[in-house]
Swiss-Prot record:
Organism expressing this protein natively: Grammomys surdaster
Record protein name field: Apolipoprotein C-I
GO biological process terms, semicolon-separated: lipid transport; lipoprotein metabolic process; negative regulation of cholesterol transport; negative regulation of lipid catabolic process; negative regulation of very-low-density lipoprotein particle clearance; triglyceride metabolic process; very-low-density lipoprotein particle clearance
Function: Inhibitor of lipoprotein binding to the low density lipoprotein (LDL) receptor, LDL receptor-related protein, and very low density lipoprotein (VLDL) receptor. Associates with high density lipoproteins (HDL) and the triacylglycerol-rich lipoproteins in the plasma and makes up about 10% of the protein of the VLDL and 2% of that of HDL. Appears to interfere directly with fatty acid uptake and is also the major plasma inhibitor of cholesteryl ester transfer protein (CETP).
Transmembrane is among the record's keywords: no
Main location: secreted
Membrane-spanning ranges: none
Keyword match Transport: yes
Gene coding for it: Apoc1
One Gene Ontology term of the molecular function aspect: phospholipase inhibitor activity
Similarity section: Belongs to the apolipoprotein C1 family.
Entry's localization field: Secreted
Length: 88
């Protein structure tokens, strides 16, 4: 799962770093770009993490999903008990 998320993040960051400055900006040298890269990565990672957490919380709070999760849990418990009594 981490690799699944890490590869696209790495590709985006490398693309951002290689894109270079806008024409109106002075061209920074390579060392200053590389110095800012960890800060940009940290900012991008925290933003991505916040958005992912918000999406997961939103999904958890939806009523239909909560009802579905409850129904699956109850059904699984019933099947488990039935199998336990049948094969015990």
């Amino acid at each position: 799962m981490r690799l699944f998320i890490a590869l696209p993040v790495l590709i985006v960051v490398v693309a951002m770093a290689l894109e270079g400055p806008a024409p109106a900006q002075a061209a920074p040298d390579l060392s200053s770009t590389l110095e800012r890269l960890p800060d940009k990565l940290k900012e991008f990672g925290s933003t991505l993490e916040d958005k992912a957490r918000e999406a997961i919380d939103h999904i958890k709070q939806k009523e239909i999903l909560t009802k579905t999760r409850t129904w699956f849990s109850e059904t699984f418990s019933k099947v488990k008990e039935k199998l336990k009594t049948t094969f015990a």
